[in-house]
Amino acid sequence: MPEITRFYGIVIKIFFQNEHNPPHIHAIYGEHNALFSIKDMQMIEGDLPARAVKLVQEWGRPFAKELQQMWDTKELKKLPPLK
């Protein structure tokens, strides 16, 4: 699963092979793993601590267009971390 970015111990990845809708990203934080919808950055599966969920959403919302483009074209592009 290609890594897009990482920040505060959270790794953001996108998986292109055999993916299924809705378009989403994977967030991994320690032993926790969750899927977030690219459209609205809502957690659609998995579990993350509440603080990590907020950080993923804060990071992902400004990059929704870039993430959707990656999903559509299956071309990975590294994105800057949350600061």
What label would you give each PLM region?
Residues 1-2, 22-25, 66-68:
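Intrinsically disordered, low-complexity boundary segments flanking structured domains
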Residues 1-19:
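Short, charged/polar N-terminal "headpieces" of proteins
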Residues 10-15, 35, 68-73:
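Broad hydrophobic/π-residue packing in well-ordered secondary structure
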Residues 2, 35, 40, 59, ...:
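Short, functionally important structural connectors and interaction interfaces within domains
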Residues 54-83:
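C-terminal structural segments of small proteins and small subunits
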